[in-house]
Structure formats: structure tokens, C-alpha cells
A protein has these predicted regions:
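Short, solvent-exposed loop/turn segments at secondary-structure junctions
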Residues: 11-13, 48-53, 90-93, 136-139, ...
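NAD(P)-dependent short-chain dehydrogenase/reductase
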Residues: 108, 116, 120-176, 182
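Active-site regions of enzymes building and remodeling cell-envelope glycoconjugates
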Residues: 22-34, 38-46, 61-62, 82, ...
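N-terminal Rossmann NAD(P)H-binding glycine-rich loop of SDR-like oxidoreductase domains
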Residues: 2-24
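Mid/C-terminal beta-alpha module of Rossmann-like enzyme folds, strongest
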Residues: 178-239, 243-261
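Conserved catalytic-site region of short-chain dehydrogenase/reductase
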Residues: 86-99, 110, 137-142
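NAD(P)H-binding glycine-rich loop region in Rossmannoid oxidoreductase-like domains
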Residues: 5, 32-96
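Structural signature of the Rossmann-like NAD(P)-dependent dehydrogenase/reductase core
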Residues: 46, 83-86, 130-136, 193
Length: 261
């Protein structure tokens, strides 16, 4: 029925957290995905594969990701949601984007192209969509965040850390997702980048595992810049409006609370 709700990706990190705190009529994963076919929903939460399983894990098998993405695209028309909350990555957006920045049309990176394809088709076929673009997920699993995984469980070698020291990271805690989405839905906005203040690799090392600071290598001109995306809707969370949902000081305190020894 049209007032029923569904969560696609219920057994994932985001899904477990969200569905334990909010009731959904249908908890969907790949094993029972077909039961959504032919149904209408008042609201559906839809997790992109990279958000559900981790960007690093998905990148490790892009062919499987392409098959999964194409399967989902081919069956979008079989599901009829009134409102779709699509939780995806920022890979289809430039590194300094906000919600007014057009998404990329194509990419030479097949992983990014899969994100683009599902984003484009879902928004084309469904009428009312809230796109939630996560810059970087603060999950210490190497599938989600190799940097956090290394800082919390480093090897015992003296070799330099395999991360650019000045690269920006915008770490988004999964625990925020339900509250942030609940705040966005009444606004009627089509997209939100829940942007956290950017922290460099060096800042994160000193914050979460200072003993590794001596293993930071020197910066190189070819190093990635990282993410410094902002939100035009940040004033809904924080005043004055600076593009971020929290202050840098609060972000650092939260990361220390969850991840510092």
C-alpha cells in the first residue's frame, strides 16, 4: 500500500543502525529484493552499493558492481515509491561541490560511472527524491575507510603511511544519518551534502594516533587534494552559515570520542 515503507540495504552498517531506531514495513536486501516488485511505498530508503558495502570493497570488484548497478537500474520501474531517500557517495560531484553543482555526466573510472548511472536513472524515473551525498564514511573497516582502519590498527613496521599527508577528509559518522535525513525531508530539498569540516591526514593522525606522526611522508605535488565539499543548507544545522554541519572543534571531539584510544 502507498503508506508502507521499505529500506533497501537493511543488513548493512547504515541499515542496521537506521532500522533499529525507525520502523519500516519491509526490510530489503538482495535475497528478498524481488518482493518490492509491483509494490507502491510511501517512502523508500535506497542505499547505493558503495554506501551499503564500502567504497574500497566495491572498487575491488568493479565488474560485480557494474552487474549489480545495472540490475538495480533495470528494476527501478518495478518499484513505485512516493518519496525516495537515496543515500549515495559524492563521487559524481567535484571535490569542491555543493548541492547546486551539476553532477558529472560521465567518468573514465568505471566505479564512478556506476555511481553516476544509478544516480541519474533513479532521479529520472522517480518523482520525489532526496539525494544524500556522503563525502567519506567514518567507519573503521578497511572496506569503508582504509585511513581510519590503519590509524586504529596499524602494522608494526616503520614504513611511511600510504596516505597523502595534506589530503582533506570529511568523515561522516553513520550515527548521524537518520537525524540528518529527518531534518531534510520537511525542507523539500532535492539533495543534501552533509558536509563535515575537512581534516587533513596529518590532523587525523595527530588526533587519533599521534605515535604514527613520525611515519607521515613528505607531501608531493601529485598528491590528491581530497574532499572540501560544502552544503548550501548548512544553516539548518549551524549558524553562522559556513557550509558545514558542525564546527571543526566539534567534529574533532566526536572523532576522538568514537575512535581515539
Amino acid at each position: 500500500m502507498a503508506y508502507e515503507t521499505a529500506f533497501l540495504g537493511a543488513s548493512t552498517v547504515f541499515g542496521k543502525y537506521w532500522t533499529k531506531r525507525r520502523y519500516f514495513d519491509y526490510l530489503i536486501d538482495k535475497d528478498n529484493f524481488k518482493i518490492t516488485f509491483g509494490r507502491s511505498f510511501g517512502m523508500m530508503v535506497y542505499l547505493d552499493n558503495a554506501v551499503a558495502n564500502g567504497p574500497a570493497k566495491v572498487r575491488a570488484d568493479v565488474e560485480a558492481d557494474t552487474r549489480a548497478t545495472n540490475y538495480l537500474i533495470n528494476h527501478l520501474a518495478d518499484i513505485k515509491p512516493e518519496l525516495t531517500v537515496f543515500v549515495t557517495t559524492c563521487d559524481m560531484l567535484p571535490e569542491t561541490a555543493d548541492e547546486n553543482t551539476p553532477a558529472l555526466e560521465k567518468s573514465d573510472d568505471p566505479y564512478v560511472q556506476n555511481r553516476i548511472n544509478l544516480y541519474r536513472e533513479l532521479n529520472r524515473q522517480y518523482g520525489r527524491v532526496l539525494n544524500v551525498h556522503l563525502p567519506e564514511i567514518a567507519n573503521p573497516s578497511p572496506d569503508f575507510n582504509p585511513l581510519l582502519a590503519t590509524l586504529l590498527n596499524p602494522d608494526q613496521s616503520d614504513s611511511p603511511l600510504p596516505f597523502a599527508p595534506l589530503e582533506y577528509h570529511q568523515l561522516y559518522l553513520p550515527q548521524r544519518i537518520m537525524g540528518d535525513v529527518d531534518r531534510c525531508i520537511p525542507l523539500g530539498i532535492p539533495a543534501i551534502i552533509p558536509a563535515m569540516p575537512p581534516l587533513t591526514t596529518t590532523e587525523l593522525v595527530k588526533l587519533l594516533n599521534p605515535a604514527l606522526a613520525e611515519r607521515l611522508r613528505a607531501p608531493e605535488t601529485t598528491d590528491p587534494r581530497g574532499s572540501d565539499r560544502t552544503s548550501i543548507h548548512s544553516f539548518q544545522w549551524l549558524d553562522p552559515k559556513d557550509g558545514y554541519l558542525v564546527t571543526k572543534e566539534d567534529e574533532m571531539e566526536l572523532l576522538k570520542f568514537y575512535f581515539a584510544p
